[in-house]
Amino acid sequence: MLSRLRRALRFQRDGIIRSASGLKSVRVQAAVAMLLALNVVLSYFGSFYLSPEIKVSTSFLALSSTAYLFGPIPAALSGALTDVIQYFLRPAGPYFPGYTVSGILGGLIYGACLYRREGKALLVGIPLSKLLINLLVNIVLNTLWLHLLNGAPFFAMLPARALKNAVLFPFEAALMYALTLFLAKNRSRILPGL
């Protein structure tokens, strides 16, 4: 058991180093920038609000694609930059760095679960990453950020946000699975030379 844990941690460390060194390539930078732009576009045009505190969005697809193709470091940078760019394009109140932290954590979680995964590991990584992000980032952290920003009661918002994430989880995981399979099968055509 301990040897499996060591192998998993070594795999994660190597994946982080590999994904960070991949950012030295201009082609990788350009591809990550295009996925970052797609993330920003999807956050505006691929989302809607059920209430002021509950947003449904498809922008997670661009971030998970960045993580699958390029790893946790480019995905974390993309998550952070997406939040900052969104703020400058359409500010809704003062800038709050908590959402940037959420973007970074989302990219790191997707990257840890999806980068360089194939077969059964990918099949487990997709729902695991979405579950971790829904629980830790969407339900806990983002609810905390809303509480700190708006003064809305944390525990009063929690049930509605948890219900939204629970209902959307199977659909989001299925969309991620379909997109990741498409990327896996067509990677050489989509990103020639990478």
Identify what each model region corresponds to.
Residues 1-194:
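Loop-helix junctions at membrane interfaces
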